[in-house]
Amino acid sequence: MNENSRLHTHSNIRNTFFSEIGIGISGNSFLLLFHIIKFFRGHRPRLTDLPIGLLSLIHLLMLLVAAVIATDIFISWRGWNDIICKFLVYLYRSLRGLSLCTTSMLSVLQAIILSPRSYCLAKFKRKSSHNISCAIIFLSVLYMSISSHLFISITATLNLTMNNFLYVSQSCSLLPLSYLMQSMYSTLLVLREVFLIGLMVLSTSYMVALLCMHRKQAQNLQGTSLSLKTAPEQRATQTILMLMTFFVLMSIFDSIVSSSRAMFLDDSTCYSIYIFVMHIYATVSPFVFMSTEKHLVNFFRSMCEWIINM
């Protein structure tokens, strides 16, 4: 068994990882609950509410599945069979793909919302929510089809008699694929990453250009260099811009660490960094979204004041 199988002996790594997962589950649960309450109370939904609520649900499920898999990495376990290994790993990878698809479509939707009426993208505003939902479903089904090879390559470690497998957890391992299969799968994944991250970069650049143009117009109208009070649309755009930048950086770092891990199968340090980095975006994003909600900010502020005055 390789060095990764001894990760359960590293208490600091285990505590750090479960702390990250716990914070992420709490944040996404609160954000999802907020959107559910907002919906049932009859508040007029914004176009971005559906994808943000969907993203929080995806991240919540992904972190829960990650927590289950982590128990088999960091805690001594009796062992899972092939069916459990295949189901958990496939579900986790599918949820990660859904996260990427939804984040990309959210950036495109915000670019459409921000577009002035005279721009061609403004024509899609009325049906943007429906179109984005269809795009998310299509991309998700496509990615789940790409990941179907996991039903063949994931197996229970107890069934293995060779040493060149890739460690997933104490019970589950990834069998090496043939050169042709590995090349096809890698090509499809690269195309998916380039397409979706390319959409994010394009929509983000477009929104930055619109915000800069709007600020210049506002300064000309005011006749002063002082900035105007930020509009709700601009606040939402700035939030999504920050998330998109963060997501792209995390995706690049994730790819670098993942490639390094493929080259150094027995490096437990590389694997520890890999499993930590994979969940940073899912952990941080709900708190960034909640920071733009005035009702939530005021609620937390009053709670802090109440605790301080106790």
Curated annotation (Swiss-Prot):
GO terms for molecular function: pheromone receptor activity. One of its GO terms (cellular component) is plasma membrane. Residues 38-49, 115-131, 215-238, 291-310 are cytoplasmic. InterPro entries: GPCR_Rhodpsn_7TM (IPR017452), Vmron_rcpt_1 (IPR004072). It is a multi-pass membrane protein. Residues 1-16, 71-91, 153-193, 260-269 are extracellular. One of its GO terms (biological process) is response to pheromone. It is found in: Cell membrane. Belongs to the G-protein coupled receptor 1 family. Putative pheromone receptor implicated in the regulation of social and reproductive behavior. PANTHER family: VOMERONASAL TYPE-1 RECEPTOR (PTHR24062). This is Vomeronasal type-1 receptor 47. It comes from Mus musculus. The lineage of its organism: Eukaryota, Metazoa, Chordata, Craniata, Vertebrata.
